[in-house]
Design a protein with these regions (language model features):
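Substrate-binding pocket helix/loop in short-chain dehydrogenase/reductase
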Residues: 35-36, 43-45
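C-terminal helical subdomain
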Residues: 119, 140-175
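Residue(s) in the substrate-gating loop at a strand-loop-helix junction
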Residues: 79
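Conserved NAD(P)H cofactor-binding loop of Rossmann-fold oxidoreductase domains
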Residues: 27-32
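Active-site helix of classical SDR
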Residues: 59, 95
Length: 197
């Protein structure tokens, strides 16, 4: 998914095999840990491609057919990270804020078409993300008990089926999203700096 033509290859495969997609789930993504200027530049480019561009392109390729059929749901994986700046994981947090905002906007655009778009915003999830992002100095997974991947998937499925635009997973995630809106942004940034180590 980190290649610029990855989304087109997926879309073209469905055309070649005559597969109709009416419920795409855009859940590919990854994070990286460290100060912005110290993280590998190619890894940062790949993160932006996977977390933002491929998700946008897949949505763009599949949405017209869904709108034409007046049926379907798009489920985009955002994160509780979408509600705050994330020092030491700045591109990941920014990418998830993009996904949330993008999903909400497109959801409104398609509101009268029979198609829904849902942004799923889980907190820490037991998927191997922590190891892949090299978060050994982060306190995120020790401060917040990770949800199971199955529970997050179930929450996303149910939200998409109900046509929800935004879905939080669990009370800690909902609490963090509320706190991020009520507290000064400087307080949120400092808190996330401590959480991220």
């Amino acid at each position: 998914m980190s290649q610029p033509d990855a989304a087109y290859e997926v879309f073209n495969y469905t055309l070649e095999k005559n597969i109709t997609i009416d419920a795409p789930v855009n859940n590919a993504g990854f994070g990286d840990f460290g100060n912005f200027w110290e993280v590998d530049a190619q890894r940062q480019t790949d993160l932006l491609q996977v977390n933002i561009m491929t998700l946008v392109q897949l949505t763009r390729y599949f949405l017209p057919g869904m709108v034409e059929r007046r049926h379907g749901s798009v489920l985009n994986l955002s994160s509780v990270a979408a509600f705050s700046a994330g020092p030491r994981m700045c591109l990941y947090y920014a990418s998830k804020e993009f996904v949330r905002s993008f999903s909400e906007a497109v959801a409104e655009e398609v509101r009268s078409t029979g198609v829904t778009v849902t942004a799923l915003c889980p907190g820490p999830t037991a998927t191997g993300f922590e190891q892949a992002a090299q978060m050994k100095n982060s306190h995120m997974f020790s401060m917040f008990k990770p949800a199971s991947a199955a529970a997050v998937a179930e929450a996303g499925f149910r939200a998409a089926q109900k046509g929800k635009t935004l879905r939080y997973c669990g009370w800690p995630t909902h609490t963090v999203s509320i706190a991020a809106r009520l507290l000064p942004r400087s307080v949120c940034r400092r808190f996330m700096m401590k959480v991220n180590g």
